[in-house]
Amino acid sequence: MMGQEAAPTGPPNRELYALLNLSPEASDEEIRKAYRQWAQVYHPDKIQSPQMKEVATENFQRICEAYEILSDETKRLIYDLYGMEGLNSGLELGPRLSKADEIKEELERIKRRNEEAKKMAHFQPTGSILFNLSVPHFLVGDGIMRGMVMASQVQSQLSKDDAIAIGGNLAANEKSGGGVATAILRRQISPVSSIEFVASTGLQSLIGVQTTRQLTIHSTATINISKSLSDGSINLTNTWTRQLSETSSGNIELALGMRSAITVGWKKRDENVSAAGDFKIESGGLGASARYTRKLSSKSHGRIVGRIGSNALEIELGGGRQISEFSTVRMMYTVGLKGIFWKVELHRGSQKLIVPILLSAHLAPVFATGAFIVPTSLYFLLKKFVVKPYLLKREKQKALENMEKTWGQVGEARARAEKAQQLLQTVATRKKNRQVETDGLIVTKALYGDPKAIERRNEGVEGLDSGVIDVTVPMNFLVSDSGQLKLHEGVKKSGIMGFCDPCPGQPKQLYIAYTYHSQPFEVIVGDYEELSIPQEGQ
């Protein structure tokens, strides 16, 4: 099962919906009903204690502000797109807009314009470096470095419809080297078609043009024609791509020229699996390749690659792991006609470092087996005895540092949540007693916060745990008269009245133990997941 290793970001601008426990698609009537429910509890005139009256006043103002924004069609649309920042900045939409559709269209136009401006303000660099190393050559004193290849490209948006990319390749071995410089100008002709002009100079000087058009909602066609400036040859390539399903696509490519070929390919990609394959017929023979990648956890994956053809036969096995937000490392083992290789890759953003290491040019079964088993065993040993303990220690250290930084903030939020729960207590108890009489839904225990801290609480470990807050009272308050409890998808639960964020920056869960028709049940949901109890069939 995949571990939760990072706090999900979730949809933006949902705090006011959480405050009133509303769905982002709530109707005007549902908004009014929720407002009345919360206002009856937190109205200051209903509170006798001076201390609690101050708490009630603060929460009542928050409820009124949420209702004022969500009940106003224009303000709600601005909030949904830009949040409180958009409202506080006094975003003007113009007096000519009166209908909801017009307002929404104008807001989306402004948002698109801002996104385009942001996109145009940034360059998009990509690059890769490949070092070819050879152990056999090193052992005979001939040096370990056998060659190097570098590729780099920078793309920039010139306007809404125009983009330019400038790049180059450089290759060198122990005796010779060379390079190619390339410039690409791309123009979006219409929403369904584009054209590119390509020019390169160096070892492969050429000029070319490529156009792409979306034929149907599921089909795309691309035609490319290029002329070599060195030998005058002309190459023509046609590619047809078809979306086969939501997660897979197929393509057929026909190339005419110096290297005429027909290629049929297939790709599939979903949340946990990525696969691709192609079959190629060319003048020099036949060839096929396949690649399968599976996500093993939220930060690691395994991969197998196979190639077979008239002059190729090899298989790759390996995997990779994300070591930071932007960096991934990968180790592959390759055995084939060219020999036995290890390949180490480092990916950071759009930059790649690839180091193939030739271990042996001969296919000795014992050596091939050892070359696979030794690094694999070493990896699992290091992972168990070095990497995991280190990562666990670092995770605890980060959690401790985060706790120290946010201690005061969390303490204040927890105090506000507990006072808000005190005001809910009377109504929550009354609702609970009503459910007891009808043998309905009764929340016996509800905890919100760090999943590990919740697990420790459930195992009977006592003591103050700052990673969790008890939310039994607000959960009983939110049980409807019909004996149902619903929290909406996409709404962060820390914004609900009587809740707070007990562990900022960490993933959170909501644990609920309840009885229904005198039968005990338990449920755990993520911070943005929907909760609906009792579940069907209970």
UniProtKB/Swiss-Prot annotation:
Major subcellular location class: membrane
Gene3D superfamilies: DnaJ domain (1.10.287.110)
InterPro entries (UniProt xref): AtJ13, DnaJ-like_C11_C, DnaJ_domain, DnaJ_domain_CS, DNAJC11-like_beta-barrel, J_dom_sf
Coiled coil regions, renumbered to chain: 96-124
Membrane topology (UniProt): Single-pass membrane protein
Induction: Not induced by methyl viologen (paraquat), menadione, diamide, t-BuOOH, dithiothreitol (DTT) and H(2)O(2).
Tissue localization of expression: Constitutively expressed in roots, stems, leaves and flowers.
Pfam families, A to Z: DnaJ (PF00226), DnaJ-like_C11_C (PF11875), DNAJC11_beta-barrel (PF22774)
UniProt modified residues of type N-acetylmethionine: M1
Highest taxon of the lineage: Eukaryota
GO biological process: response to very low light intensity stimulus; vegetative to reproductive phase transition of meristem
Membrane-spanning ranges: 354-374
GO cellular component: endoplasmic reticulum; membrane; plastid
Keywords per UniProt: Acetylation, Chaperone, Coiled coil, Membrane, Transmembrane, Transmembrane helix
Occurrences of domain J (ranges): 15-83
Compartmental location: Membrane
The family this protein is said to belong to: Belongs to the DnaJ family. B/II subfamily.
Protein name: Chaperone protein dnaJ 13
Encoding gene (name): ATJ13
